[in-house]
Amino acid sequence: IGMRAFISNPVYLNKLVKQCSDFQSKWRMITYFHGEHTGVCHGIALSMCYGNQGYIDFDDITSGAHDYWTLGSPYENSKMKDMILYYQMTQCLDSGRSTYGISKNSGWGNGDLETFLKKFVAEAQYAKRVKKPFVFSFMIPEGGHSVVVCGYKKNTDGNHEITIYDENSYHPGSYGGYLTMKVSSDFKSFHFADSNSRFDDVCVEDLWTNLN
């Protein structure tokens, strides 16, 4: 899914401007507001999590809506479009930085992947216990993508299975769906493909769990 990077709601605009605390944040925001179409997977995933935790008034966006699924289409609802773009653009802000991260350029032999996967599994276990999903971002050959982590179980082999909702992909004919990321019991490897079974060669990137 893609949208033109333009927010008409002054409330969201003011929030973004007030949180641009330094030159780099402002520059990142300016480059986003060039008006061209942009992917909004992060905005959708993040707003899904905030909505689940009660931070979003669904009825204010779409009259009568009581959850994310009853909001309708952002292409037909400017309030929903602005909400998604707002959360998409919070990536430009210092306050919108990820909770945990691993650099795709750091290599896999220095222990960073193992540390990240341990934190990832711990967060998934906690999220299941308190029923609060969070956002997971990763890199694929075509670019970055964000999804919602919403479940966890440990299988009989001692490996970890993390349930993920992939809300969409930017490929033609793509669709949303649930999938499983498998993490080995020693946290040294993982197996993952998106909801369209496109990618096994994934570089893990970031977790967003501090949703407040």
Where are these regions (language model features)?
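Cysteine-nucleophile protease catalytic domains, especially the papain-like/related folds used
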Residues: I1-T115
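A sequence-composition feature that detects small, non-aromatic residues
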Residues: A5, A45, A65, A122-A127, ...
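Phenylalanine-focused residue identity feature
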Residues: F6, F23, F33, F58, ...
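Context-gated lysine
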Residues: K15-K18, K26, K79-K81, K104, ...
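Histidine (H) residue identity feature
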Residues: H34-H37, H42, H66, H145, ...
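Generic ordered-secondary-structure signal
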Residues: G43-L46, Y50-I56, C150-Y152, D166, ...
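Active-site-adjacent substructure of cysteine-protease-like catalytic cores
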Residues: S106-Y165
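Cys-His-centered catalytic/binding microenvironment captured across papain-like cysteine peptidases
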Residues: P141-G143, K153-N212
